[in-house]
């Protein structure tokens, strides 16, 4: 029940694992959750469909997703791998 609640709230695998440990529940690796899809939905709900406009916006979105407990790899895939380099010319 805690797992489903946290996923519905938009939390990622790292945050979920931490919450389960804090509650004294054994974390199961067999959760059938598509974390990439979950992160995309959370990001879209918060920021809409538009991609990051500059490095600052990219960083803001990345911090938001990291705070929700998503892994760095998932965050890069959601925001577009290599996009942070595209903004370096700004």
Curated annotation (Swiss-Prot):
Q: Which Gene3D superfamilies match?
A: Winged helix-like DNA-binding domain superfamily/Winged helix DNA-binding domain
Any matching Pfam family: RecX_HTH2
This entry carries the following GO cellular component terms, namely:
cytoplasm
UniProt keyword annotations, A-Z: Cytoplasm
Keyword Cytoplasm annotated: yes
The principal localisation class reads cytoplasm
Its domain of life reads Bacteria
Annotated S-S bridges: none
Q: Its family?
A: Belongs to the RecX family.
Purpose of the protein: Modulates RecA activity.
Q: What is the designated name of this protein? A: Regulatory protein RecX
Q: Which organism is it from?
A: Acidithiobacillus ferridurans
